[in-house]
Design a protein with these regions (language model features):
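Active-site flanking loop/helix segments enriched in acidic
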Residues: 29-35, 116-121
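Cofactor-binding active-site loop characterized by glycine-rich and histidine/acidic residues
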Residues: 42-164
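Basic/polar N-terminal segments that are highly enriched at the extreme N-terminus
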Residues: 1-14
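Conserved, non-catalytic sequence blocks in retroelement Pol enzymes and Pol-derived host proteins
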Residues: 12, 37, 123-126
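Structural motif
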Residues: 16, 35-41
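N-terminal capping segment at the start of a domain
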Residues: 18-34
Length: 164
């Protein structure tokens, strides 16, 4: 299971993990005095399920080529993504979450690729992420078929997108 309790803590059940994701996200928004709490409260179970049960990912190697991809097309919900990445062990620390929406932080107002470990695409305007996720999925199919013709079965990732 991807979500593991932090050191010196008891085993966490699914509901508690989802509640932790929600509380962290809401605390981030409250501390920044800016953000969108609705998506944090509503979509936390979806991200928990994706990251904890379905996605093929490795928090220790967030750029592994054959990993599944997740695109938060509703980029304004970044507090949800960051709190999920924190709970899943992608290298974010509580101090990073406290720096939410601050200049030069690992947790900017909208997800930014190559800034935050585990963010597969920079998003902002609604709909931008959806179109790019379609392109990522098409690229996967193309690469899988290209390498299969050469008798190499090495590409088999999936692309997930949350639209808002």
């Amino acid at each position: 299971m991807l979500f593991k309790p932090k050191e010196n803590s008891n085993e966490l059940n699914e509901k508690k993990i989802v509640d932790h994701i929600r509380c962290l996200g809401i605390d981030m928004i409250n501390e920044a005095k800016s953000g969108h709490p609705g998506i944090v409260l509503d979509a936390a179970p979806m991200l928990y399920s994706l990251y904890g049960k379905h996605m093929k990912i490795n928090p220790n190697d967030a750029t592994w080529f054959n990993r599944d991809r997740f695109v938060l097309s509703a980029g304004h919900g970044s507090a949800l993504l960051y709190s999920t990445l924190y709970m899943a062990g992608f290298g974010l620390e509580l101090e990073d979450l406290k720096q939410f929406r601050k200049l030069a932080s690992l947790t900017p107002g909208h997800p930014e690729y190559k800034v935050t470990p585990g963010v597969d695409m920079s998003t902002g305007p609604l709909g931008q992420g959806f179109a790019t996720a379609v392109g990522i999925a098409i690229a996967e199919v193309y690469l899988r078929n290209y390498f299969k013709k050469k008798n190499h079965d090495i590409i088999d990732y999936r692309t997930y997108v949350l639209c808002g």
